[in-house]
């Protein structure tokens, strides 16, 4: 193990090395970490699984004792669980009997009360059925009227579409902007852009076109300024 992490208790001192004079006999200082720590051999004691202890043990008898103890503990647990399950079963049977008795008593009381309420329930049921039939009839009439109105609107719209789609039956002029008689060709989205048809009219120009290496004095710049700036 390295001792580089330990503090330095013996710094460099002169006087005793070769080529140095004897200054004096300096006192020595020792640290407890520099002293020997383990100076005695340790031997196995009694009960630490020595060879003599292992020879004295009867491993077969110990194994048989452990097996007997395990069987005895298992039987004790089984008997305790069986007794607890038997007591639990008895308790559940008792609870079931009590609940059955309470249910029978409740049924008897319900039969007495139901016999008194049968007459009033029949009258209420008849009134509710009559009201329900009335509501159903009103809703059916409303639905029929609504369907008839929707049908009339659809027929009217269909006839309008037929008349608008026939140019012979449409009285609006062809140049108008109405939706029914607009037969003119629509303008393109790029009709009014700045640099459209820049090469138009090149053939009509004079053959003696001179090139000027100045964008400001060029013919294109002059025409552009005349058209869009002035």
Swiss-Prot record:
PANTHER family: CELL CYCLE CONTROL PROTEIN CWF15 (PTHR12718), SPLICEOSOME-ASSOCIATED PROTEIN CWC15 HOMOLOG (PTHR12718:SF2). Residues 52-78, 131-157 have a biased composition (Basic and acidic residues). InterPro entries: Cwf_Cwc_15. GO terms for molecular function: RNA binding. GO terms for biological process: mRNA cis splicing, via spliceosome; mRNA splicing, via spliceosome. This is Spliceosome-associated protein CWC15 homolog. GO terms for cellular component: catalytic step 2 spliceosome; nucleus. Belongs to the CWC15 family. Component of a spliceosomal complex that is required for activating pre-mRNA splicing. Residues 1-157, 164-183 are annotated as: Disordered.
